[in-house]
Amino acid sequence: MSVLGVNMSLSEKQILDMKLILVFALVIFLYISTSVRNDKRYLLANEVTFKNIEQPLITEEVVNKLLIQNKGSVKNIKKVALALNSIESVLDANPYVRNSEVYVSVNGSVGVDVLQKKPLARVQTKESYYIDEEGKKMPTSPNFAVRVPLVSGDGVESNLNNMFKLLKSIDSDSFYKKEIVEIIVSKKGKYKLLLREFDLFIDFGTTENIELKLNNFKAFYKKATKDKTINKYKYVNLQIASQVICTKI
């Protein structure tokens, strides 16, 4: 009786082990099957989110075309065929894109976060291009015009670094960002600024003491507009950092 009991006990253990193996195998099978079906699912409509886009230079339509690499609608691509890193590389190669992130949710929808480059000024010399927030050149857009200061003059190319310092200061100040419409650069690295609201010509001089000069002019501007005398002036000289020399009409 005891021998039979031992055999019965061993058989039950073997059966239990087999059941556990079958359950484990079933779990693996279901996981693999689900993954395969998930990869073969067609992607749903994507959602594009733009960042740093005060003024657009790239559209959702352009992103979609880059996203699928000219293969048609995003709905025609299976998840397994979407190489996220490759798509991000394609997007990042666009001259208006600073950085991008492409991701696919569990339900198959595609998300794209696009960080657009920010133009600080538009250069108009022998060639036309933007200067971005890193001081690098970027092409103008055939579809959009960005409202930024126009930069011209025969000293642009030889003074790009110093010009960028001035552009950064202008962009960081809401007053100057709104008011400065044109910057003329001489070969000697001297700058002339034109205002949007008033017909006032500013001889800024070099980029030494940028912040001091900008603060001095802003103080003059506030006083002259408050006194309603701003229209009496045609020319303001800021070449001497500690002075604001004005010439009346």
Which residue ranges define each predicted feature?
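N-terminal positively charged amphipathic segments used for targeting/anchoring
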Residues: 1-65, 69, 74, 187-249
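Terminal hydrophobic membrane-targeting helix
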Residues: 39-128, 132-143
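Envelope-exposed proteins and targeting segments
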Residues: 44-46, 87, 93-98, 106-110, ...
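Extracytoplasmic/secreted envelope proteins and their assembly/folding machinery
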Residues: 60, 64, 84, 88, ...
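A broadly tuned preference for mixed-charge, low-complexity surface segments
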Residues: 81, 101-103, 150-170, 203-208, ...
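Short, intrinsically disordered, mixed-charge
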Residues: 93-96, 172, 219-222, 226
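Extracytoplasmic segments of membrane-associated envelope/inner-membrane machinery
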Residues: 113-187, 193, 202
